[in-house]
UniProtKB/Swiss-Prot annotation:
<dbReference type="GO" id="GO:0042301">
    <property type="term" value="F:phosphate ion binding"/>
</dbReference>
<protein>
    <recommendedName>
        <fullName>Photosystem II reaction center protein H</fullName>
    </recommendedName>
</protein>
<keyword id="KW-0604">Photosystem II</keyword>
<feature type="transmembrane region" description="Helical">
    <location>
        <begin position="29"/>
        <end position="49"/>
    </location>
</feature>
<dbReference type="GO" id="GO:0005886">
    <property type="term" value="C:plasma membrane"/>
</dbReference>
<comment type="similarity">
    <text>Belongs to the PsbH family.</text>
</comment>
<dbReference type="GO" id="GO:0009523">
    <property type="term" value="C:photosystem II"/>
</dbReference>
<dbReference type="GO" id="GO:0050821">
    <property type="term" value="P:protein stabilization"/>
</dbReference>
<dbReference type="InterPro" id="IPR036863">
    <property type="entry name" value="PSII_PsbH_sf"/>
</dbReference>
<keyword id="KW-1133">Transmembrane helix</keyword>
<dbReference type="InterPro" id="IPR001056">
    <property type="entry name" value="PSII_PsbH"/>
</dbReference>
<dbReference type="GO" id="GO:0015979">
    <property type="term" value="P:photosynthesis"/>
</dbReference>
<keyword id="KW-0472">Membrane</keyword>
<keyword id="KW-0602">Photosynthesis</keyword>
<keyword id="KW-0997">Cell inner membrane</keyword>
<keyword id="KW-1003">Cell membrane</keyword>
<comment type="function">
    <text>One of the components of the core complex of photosystem II (PSII), required for its stability and/or assembly. PSII is a light-driven water:plastoquinone oxidoreductase that uses light energy to abstract electrons from H(2)O, generating O(2) and a proton gradient subsequently used for ATP formation. It consists of a core antenna complex that captures photons, and an electron transfer chain that converts photonic excitation into a charge separation.</text>
</comment>
Amino acid sequence: MARRTWLGDRLKPLNSEIGKASPGWGTTPIMGALIALFGVFLIIILQIANNSLLLEGVNEGVPQSPAGQGYGYYPQSR
């Protein structure tokens, strides 16, 4: 026989709706919006890493990455 615990008693109501489906679309629009926002976040991160997104005052004086200089990376001699 399974032992009853305080945590189990607290979590039991969360599992009482098992097997029942929510009518209509449920939380699908919220999930779609969050996926879209995550996609925008990933695109912004990609553009920053690729130096194709210019930010005012952030990219000034910063050398470009090797990807931004072309296929070969040739450091300048001192």
